[in-house]
C-alpha cells in the first residue's frame, strides 16, 4: 500500500517570498529523489485558475468579503478534488503556495470578521489541514514594496495598502501561535538561500 504524501503549505503576506521558498523546497525534494507537486492558491487546477483571475485582478472593492470567501472556497474545493488529493494518494508530497490559512486570515480576520463562517465552510467543503505550514514572516513595509514592484497585474490585495498588510501579518502570526503543532514561523527578511536552508532544516525535523 502506498504511503500517502504530505501536504506542505507556505503562508505569509504578499511579497514575503513564500512563493520563492515553495519553489526552492520543491527543487530540494526533487534533488533528493522525490516527486513533489508544486501548486498554488487560488488556482492550481484549471477551474481554480479561472476563479483566481476573478479574485486577484481588478478593483480592490470588486467583491464583498462574503462573495470573496465563497469564490476562494470554490477554487480550493476544485483544487483539492482534481489535484491535491490524487497526488497525495499516489504518495507524492504536495507543496502549495497558500491554502486554507490564507482564507482564515484574509477573509476571516481582516475582511469583515467572517472567521466563524470561514471555519464552517472549511469543515463542510475542504475538511483537511496541511501536515506542515511554513509562515514566511517579513516586515509589511518591505513586503508591500516588493509585491507592488512585481507589476504582475495580480496586485488587487496589495492595493489595499500598508494597514491591510500589517493586519495580515498579525493574523498570520496569531494563527501560527494557535497551531504550533503544524506551523513554523520563518524569518523571511534574510538572503533567499538562508531562508531556504531554514525551511529544509525544519522539514527534516518534522519528517
Swiss-Prot record:
Stretch list, region Disordered: 11-49
Protein keywords: ATP-binding, Kinase, Nucleotide biosynthesis, Nucleotide-binding, Transferase
Protein origin, superkingdom: Bacteria
Keyword Kinase on entry: yes
EC number(s) stated in the UniProt entry for this protein: 2.7.4.9
GO molecular function: ATP binding; dTMP kinase activity
GO cellular component, one term: cytosol
PANTHER family: THYMIDYLATE KINASE, UMP-CMP KINASE 2, MITOCHONDRIAL
Biological function: Phosphorylation of dTMP to form dTDP in both de novo and salvage pathways of dTTP synthesis.
Protein name as catalogued: Thymidylate kinase
Organism listed in the record: Dinoroseobacter shibae (strain DSM 16493 / NCIMB 14021 / DFL 12)
Gene (UniProt): tmk
